[in-house]
Amino acid sequence: VQTWRGFDFNGHFADWKNQLTEYCSGDYIFQIDADEIPHQVLLGYLPEILGNNPDNEVYLVPRINTVEGITDEHIKKWGWNVNDKGWVNYPDYQWRIWKNKPEIKWKNKVHEVLEGFKTYAPIPSTEQLSLYHPKTIDRQEKQNAYYNTL
């Protein structure tokens, strides 16, 4: 039986994520944002990656960002790099997988990072081992404006 829990968001992303992880019961936590899509190959390889590296506590997962409608003006304004595939800031590593240990916690109100671990490693930056993170320019601008209010 699954129990769904709702939490009021207080404008502090790390506090919110830390509250949610208290309900996790597995050996590892794989936390992705609502707008991120893991590649099926990544999902298939996770047991092998985790099993082959039992001493590693945290994994950084590469993320493919795409922004429909982005212009050279946006790229320059935000200091982004866009490759020939249209991927923004690739591999844009994200803290997404970690051992479920009470000392590993999120910090920072916005653009959160994990703390309380000793070992970490990046997952190789290939398309098949990445998260896909599609956006529109309208959504990106609204998100930037919202983050500026926090």
Indicate where each model-derived feature is located:
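Acidic donor-binding segment of Leloir-type glycosyltransferases
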Residues: 1-10, 19
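Catalytic-site signature of metal-activated, phosphate-bearing donor transferases
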Residues: 11-21, 28, 39-150
